[in-house]
Amino acid sequence: MLKEIRPALVMLVALTALTGLVYPLAMTGVAQLLLPAQANGSLIEQNGQVIGSALIGQAFTDARYFHGRPSATTAPDPQDSSKTVPSPYNAANSMGANLGPTSAALKERLTADVDAAKQDNPTSPVPVDLVTSSASGLDPDISPEAALFQVPRVAKARGIDEAKLRALIDSQIQGRELGLLGEPRVNVLKLNLALDRMAA
């Protein structure tokens, strides 16, 4: 009987070693050699401290900063572990809202978000990405239109000329990947860091 099982056991051990150890270690080594910043999470540092990742959004709420998309991520409720509470940009619990198009809760949230956005800029249509969360809830980017929509609020809060902010946004626009994939976008963390440098 051992004779019949032995080839299967040898194959199991060999493939486990190959796919569980050799391949991941080889890919990690290649990534560290060719793309070390990306392999380590595209971390962004300021004054020697890691302040975030270019790949994961952050919850900016101060009027002096550009805001990202809403995040639907949650965390366990400290008072009742069977429930959850909102925890924007919680990378440990990446998910969308899972609310359907006929959901009353979704309609209520969208209406409140649109009304809040209109307070900052009542004359322009609200870009959809300022009121809808991404599938992961962690999207670090917004459309150039969403960034431009926020210019009046940021300019007023900082006392900066709107034309300077529009020029700053233009300098931060990332084009389509390979010239055809995705849409032009602005990384909110990088934009806010550039904003702080400009104001300094």
From Swiss-Prot:
<dbReference type="InterPro" id="IPR003820">
    <property type="entry name" value="KdpC"/>
</dbReference>
<comment type="similarity">
    <text>Belongs to the KdpC family.</text>
</comment>
<keyword id="KW-0997">Cell inner membrane</keyword>
<feature type="region of interest" description="Disordered">
    <location>
        <begin position="68"/>
        <end position="97"/>
    </location>
</feature>
<dbReference type="GO" id="GO:0005886">
    <property type="term" value="C:plasma membrane"/>
</dbReference>
<feature type="transmembrane region" description="Helical">
    <location>
        <begin position="9"/>
        <end position="31"/>
    </location>
</feature>
<comment type="function">
    <text>Part of the high-affinity ATP-driven potassium transport (or Kdp) system, which catalyzes the hydrolysis of ATP coupled with the electrogenic transport of potassium into the cytoplasm. This subunit acts as a catalytic chaperone that increases the ATP-binding affinity of the ATP-hydrolyzing subunit KdpB by the formation of a transient KdpB/KdpC/ATP ternary complex.</text>
</comment>
<keyword id="KW-0067">ATP-binding</keyword>
<feature type="compositionally biased region" description="Polar residues">
    <location>
        <begin position="71"/>
        <end position="96"/>
    </location>
</feature>
<keyword id="KW-0547">Nucleotide-binding</keyword>
<protein>
    <recommendedName>
        <fullName>Potassium-transporting ATPase KdpC subunit</fullName>
    </recommendedName>
</protein>
<keyword id="KW-0406">Ion transport</keyword>
<comment type="subunit">
    <text>The system is composed of three essential subunits: KdpA, KdpB and KdpC.</text>
</comment>
<dbReference type="GO" id="GO:0008556">
    <property type="term" value="F:P-type potassium transmembrane transporter activity"/>
</dbReference>
<keyword id="KW-1003">Cell membrane</keyword>
<keyword id="KW-0630">Potassium</keyword>
<keyword id="KW-0813">Transport</keyword>
<dbReference type="Pfam" id="PF02669">
    <property type="entry name" value="KdpC"/>
</dbReference>
<dbReference type="GO" id="GO:0005524">
    <property type="term" value="F:ATP binding"/>
</dbReference>
<keyword id="KW-0472">Membrane</keyword>
<keyword id="KW-0812">Transmembrane</keyword>
<keyword id="KW-1133">Transmembrane helix</keyword>
<keyword id="KW-0633">Potassium transport</keyword>
